[in-house]
Amino acid sequence: FKSLTKYSPGRQN
């Protein structure tokens, strides 16, 4: 979920 990066930056990316 790339959208989750907005809430948790550094988690998915």
UniProtKB/Swiss-Prot annotation:
Record's keyword terms, sorted: Neurotoxin, Secreted, Toxin
UniProt main location, coarse: secreted
Expression sites (tissue/organ): Expressed by the venom gland.
This entry carries the following GO cellular component terms, namely:
extracellular region
SS bonds (residue pairs)? none
Lineage, top-rank taxon, reads Eukaryota
Q: Where in the cell is it found?
A: Secreted
Q: What GO molecular function annotations does the UniProt record carry, in alphabetical order?
A: toxin activity
Q: Which family does it belong to?
A: Belongs to the scolopendra toxin 7 family.
Protein name as it appears in the record: Scolopendra 6940.74 Da toxin
Where is the organism placed in the taxonomic lineage, from the top? Eukaryota, Metazoa, Ecdysozoa, Arthropoda, Myriapoda
